[in-house]
Each structure stands twice: as structure tokens, then as C-alpha cells.
A protein has these predicted regions:
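Active-site glycine-centered loops adjacent to acidic/histidine catalytic or metal-binding residues
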Residues: 10, 36
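General beta-strand structural signal in soluble alpha/beta enzymes
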Residues: 4-9
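Short glycine-aspartate micro-motif
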Residues: 30-34, 40-42, 72-74
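ATP-binding/phosphotransfer module of carbohydrate and carboxylate kinases, centering on a glycine-rich
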Residues: 1-3, 17-27, 49, 67-158
Length: 158
């Protein structure tokens, strides 16, 4: 017998998996967000993957969350979520913060990565906490807007 194989974007496939067997089980509408070196997402509407006209329907990393940003994102726009909520975005935020002031922080003593920033947060490092708050602020903006656009309602049992 012949088995068919389909290939898809990692975030889209993750969203399908969550809908079929995970946190989205039993729901026909959901948004899955993936955070890594970039920010991706899979959007499922009425049980179907939203792929968009050019196959980039779930590229939520390029939602604009900061209209005052002066640096360009890799896509050419400014203020994209990926500039703040990806691993590379967290490093960018940290390097910018370290260059702007002389505050004492363990981040000056090691190569900055998303992991070192969040490890420093666990150690109550004030600079790392500020960076994490900025990360969370922009991720929160995007998630709130995605929830509103998807027609979701807040869960009361959190």
C-alpha cells in the first residue's frame, strides 16, 4: 500500500497537532504561537488551517506591536513582534539595554542569550527583569490582538 506524506510549516503543523490531540482538542477555532529564534503561529478557523494568499497566514511574528521602533526587522518592517519576543529579539533588547546604561547586571559578565537573560531573571537581576517585562509587554499586546481578531473569549478559570 502507498502512504501519503504531507509537509508543512512547523507552527502550522504544531497547531494542527494541538487541535487534534492537545490543548485545542474539541475546538474548531484556535491560534497556536511558537517562540524560538523567530515567532511563528498557526491559525485554525472553523477546523481549517488559515494559510493566506501566499501561504503566510500564520506569520504572526510580523504583527506590528511598536509603531515607534526605528530599527528594521528582518522582513524590512519596523516594530514586528519578532523583534521583541523571539530569542534573537531578546538578545537585541538586552544588548540595547546594556549599551544605553551602566547598570550593574550579571549580563555584562557573559555572552547574552535568551537563556542567560531568563536565568538572570531567576536570580532577581533588575536589568534582566526589565528586559523580560518588555518581552512580555509586546508578546501580551500581540496575544490580546490575536484573541480579539480570532473572536475568542477569555477563559475564566485561569
Amino acid at each position: 500500500s502507498c502512504t501519503s506524506v504531507k509537509v508543512g510549516n512547523d507552527a502550522n503543523v504544531a497547531a494542527l497537532g494541538e487541535m487534534w490531540k492537545g490543548g485545542g482538542f474539541g475546538h474548531k477555532n484556535m491560534v497556536m504561537v511558537t517562540l524560538g529564534t523567530g515567532v511563528g503561529g498557526g491559525i485554525i478557523s472553523n477546523g481549517h488551517m488559515v494559510v493566506g494568499g501566499h501561504g503566510a497566514g500564520g506569520e504572526i511574528g510580523h504583527i506590528c506591536v511598536n509603531y515607534e521602533e526605528t530599527e528594521k526587522c528582518g522582513c524590512g518592517n519596523r516594530g514586528c513582534l519578532e523583534q521583541y519576543a523571539s530569542a534573537t529579539g531578546i538578545v537585541r533588547l538586552a544588548k540595547k539595554r546594556l549599551a544605553e546604561n551602566d547598570d550593574e547586571t550579571v549580563l555584562r559578565n557573559e555572552e547574552v542569550s535568551a537563556k542567560t537573560v531568563f536565568d538572570a531573571v531567576k536570580e532577581n537581576d533588575a536589568v534582566a527583569i526589565e528586559i523580560a517585562k518588555e518581552f512580555g509587554k509586546y508578546l501580551g499586546y500581540a496575544l490580546a490582538n490575536l484573541a480579539a481578531a480570532a473572536g475568542g473569549r477569555p477563559r475564566r478559570n485561569l
